[in-house]
Amino acid sequence: YGLNVAAHLTCVDATRTETLEIAAAYAEAGVTEIVALRGDAPKGNARFTPHPDGFASSVDLVAALAATGKFKIRVGAYPEQHPDAADSRADVLWLKRKIDAGATSAITQFFFEADTFLRFRDACAAQGITAPIIPGILPIISWDGAKRFAACCGTRVPGRLNEAFETAARDGREESVSYTHLRAHETE
């Protein structure tokens, strides 16, 4: 169909051997791009704990995948700081470590305001990150679902957007706000 696809691969609940076997199966199937992520803590755990024989971090996973020479590797990036990061500078430096380990580009967590992405892009450039940073987009199917996901990811919900969705939901027009928000960002 002419679409580029990227398989997701995480460090969660797998040994290094199992993870690299999955990557090898992807390569054999013709997959050339991987989104390499640490992954979220398994349900019921407050924090991520690596498998005893697994990759301890996304940096380790990226380095191992890069060593195979078989993939373009994309990694996650957080314009509003990963919830586990000490601060935004440390988070940008962690992204730099992933790029230096062999990632070819980054895809951001979603955000609601373009300035959030632009500030992040500039902070990355200031740290010497030159790899492409692709803005992440979240199609809003349910405003309640989007707010829950934003809370999990540390994504700030602008008050004016929240008010627009809350008002529209009461009036049965939630979909029209999604479209209007999209159109507003297309013209910025």
Give the label of every model feature segment:
Residues Y1-V5, V31-T32, G69-K72, A103-T104, ...:
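Short, well-ordered coil/turn segments that N-cap beta-strands
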Residues T180-T187:
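Conserved small/polar residues in nucleotide/adenosyl-binding loops
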Residues R16-E18, G44-L61, F112-C124:
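Active-site-adjacent beta->alpha loops and helix N-cap segments on the catalytic face
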Residues V5-L9, A36, I73-G76, A106-T108, ...:
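Hydrophobic faces of well-ordered beta-strands that scaffold small-molecule active sites
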Residues A7-R16, G76-R89, A169-Y179:
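Active-site mouth loops of central-metabolism enzymes
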Residues D13-A25:
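Glycine-rich anion/phosphate-binding loops
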Residues P52-Y78, Q127-Y179:
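Active-site pocket-lining/capping segments in soluble small-molecule metabolic enzymes
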Residues A23-I34, D40-N45, P50, V59-K72, ...:
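Alpha/beta enzyme core
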